[in-house]
């Protein structure tokens, strides 16, 4: 029996309370097809990842950010890899302004291919490390910063300490250890005068895996 991407995505979004219009679903399907194709030659996701796993662990987990992002929000995704979570969110919601930072050239080629293929506007891609892009620190277009599977909370805060605006929110995508990570980051949080605004806990709809988005300001 062939895999039904649309059914899997729709069921997952419904379970998580995420609304997607039909054009958004179609863009994500194209993304899904291209991700599978490119992953045969470029290290984008773990080898052997099944189609249902791609939808749940990568697409749905990334889309969990959407309810936290107001219309037209400027999102910076550091170490985005295959575009997770930033470009997935942009494919679903083209109104977002997106900044992607990824140091590996082959992955950047994939990101640019997706942006061209989906005809997305308002995306800036940097083949670099965040510490080598000081102009981003002063950007008034960035209101949210995120990163997925790159570092713990302490490392993420250290990585983004150049962003001084009190209006910027940091969205930390975490697993079941989020409370431990937050406790370990106590000194860094205090030194930077960061406040925990809220924590959104959720379960991935098919595996039941525990996830959380820690929002820091």
Swiss-Prot record:
Q: Which GO terms describe its cellular component?
A: cytosol
Annotated residues that bind S-adenosyl-L-methionine are located at: 79, 84, 130-131, 148
Compartment annotation: Cytoplasm
Q: Which domain of life is it from?
A: Bacteria
EC category: transferase
Name the EC number(s): 2.1.1.170
Q: Which reaction does it catalyse?
A: guanosine(527) in 16S rRNA + S-adenosyl-L-methionine = N(7)-methylguanosine(527) in 16S rRNA + S-adenosyl-L-homocysteine
Task: Give any GO molecular function from the UniProt entry.
Answer: rRNA (guanine-N7-)-methyltransferase activity
UniProt-listed SUPFAM superfamilies = S-adenosyl-L-methionine-dependent methyltransferases
Keyword Methyltransferase part of the UniProt annotation: yes
Keywords, comma-separated and alphabetical: Cytoplasm, Methyltransferase, rRNA processing, S-adenosyl-L-methionine, Transferase
For this protein, the record's PANTHER family field holds: S-ADENOSYL-L-METHIONINE-DEPENDENT METHYLTRANSFERASES SUPERFAMILY PROTEIN (PTHR31760:SF0)
Give the family, as the similarity comment puts it: Belongs to the methyltransferase superfamily. RNA methyltransferase RsmG family.
Query: What is the role of the protein in this entry?
Result: Specifically methylates the N7 position of guanine in position 527 of 16S rRNA.
Q: What is this protein called?
A: Ribosomal RNA small subunit methyltransferase G
Specify the species: Desulfotalea psychrophila (strain LSv54 / DSM 12343)
User: What is this organism's lineage?
Assistant: Bacteria, Pseudomonadati, Thermodesulfobacteriota, Desulfobulbia, Desulfobulbales
Gene behind the chain: rsmG
